[in-house]
Amino acid sequence: MRILLDDCGYDWDKAWNIITNTFDYTNHTVMAEALETWDVDLMQRILPRIYAIIVEINNRYCAHLMEVTGGDSEKVTRMSIILDNRVKMANLCCAASSSVNGVSKLHSEIIKDSVFHDQYTVNPDAFKNVTNGIAYRRWLLASNQGLTNLLTECIGDGFKKDASKLADFKKFATDKSVLDKLAAVKLANKQAFAKYVYNTTGTKLNCNGIFDVQVKRLHEYKRQQLNAMNIIADYIYLLNNPDADFVPKTYIFASKAAPGYYMAKQIIKMIWCIGEELKKNPKLNEKLAVVFLEDYKVTLSEILMPASEISEQISLAGTEASGTGNMKLMLNGALTMGTYDGANVEIHEAVGDDNIFIFGMSTPEVNQLKAEGYNPEKIYNSHAVIKSVLEKMYKGINGATFEEVANSLRHADRYMCFADFDSYRGTQLSLIHISEPTRLRCISY
């Protein structure tokens, strides 16, 4: 608007018409703290002309809203771009865009039902869905040469230009020779990743065990803490049952936390400490290991994705906009275990119950539990495994205590880890015991 008004000399109406026919708004989060707002005084001081234009946009927008809502001042206040001495950037985006979309079917419904419900009721035709996607050539052809070669051998190279051709691989789902080659590709990728980890960290990985992967930004809603709770539960079980028949498993984490996000950094520290304590018990560590990789980036991801066997997509239902790691990992043959959230919903529709393992509450069930009054303390007092896990956090892991993580779960549990714990742990156990041929048939879909 500033360029069109000040540099090009357009009048307001012509400039605004160009703006609203040029811009579309893609929302990427339902987290209130991630919907950016700016302090009015700061903006006025640093960007006085921009702020003056925003004020005029808001005045005209609110006047228009008063007309179309029949004078509903409460709704207009909620939709206002400037409110409580803050400039609400998401509201500005909605006002200035010809269309608004989420990045998965579920997310797009959520923004219509809650995040931008007022805007949707005023202009429903502007809202649509555009599900996220990935550059599959990077995450398959460039990252997983062994699988690419096997696919080319089996179905030709048409899939390199047309991803839908990958469906032709289904016909080999019961072909033992192809499944054997698929298993060999996966093992080679695991060995390559293990070599990278050893060269960079000095940690040796057991390639005969399962590689269970959760790689994404560290945030409580993504529930790395739920994953950690399950690992601690396994650790306690193995301490009490050292000779138990336990399928070896390595849990691999890689993520970064926002600089000022204290709780996320505590969770990172806790995961790292779990891995370090496990190393001190070599016999147990052969069965259960944890690796937290620093400086997560695309080049590391290109080595990790092909080596992964279980993909953890475990956000609380209704909190993940889409996710793309779920797509990258599944493309490379990892079995997905996840909640009915984000793009998991559409993946489930595409591949069916046998090829993605859904656990936990649905979004309506989450909302219902919140409305009824969620009480994590009650679950803590009645659930022996959860209680033992938190007691371990209180007592210490590798010499460090994690009272703040434990208390946050016990007294608030904003993202309902306790409520989904049994379902999550049960799915973990069932997934581990899926036979190798079945796992390979699944990933050929």
What kind of feature is each model-predicted range?
Residues 143-204:
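Extended, charge-enriched "interface" segments that sit outside catalytic cores
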Residues 432-444:
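Residue-level detector of conserved catalytic or cofactor/ligand-binding positions
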Residues 3-59, 141, 149-168, 249-255:
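Extended, well-ordered alpha-helical scaffold/bundle regions in very large, multi-domain proteins
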Residues 370-431, 435:
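Long, C-terminal catalytic modules of enzymes
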Residues 23, 30-31, 191-301:
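Long, K/E/R/D-enriched contiguous segments that form extended
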Residues 309-354:
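A donor-sugar binding/catalytic signature common to diverse glycosyltransferases
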Residues 93, 101-159, 195-198, 214-245:
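Segments forming glycine/polar-rich beta-alpha architectures that bind adenosine-containing cofactors
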Residues 45, 49-98:
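Polar, glycine-rich mid-to-C-terminal structural blocks
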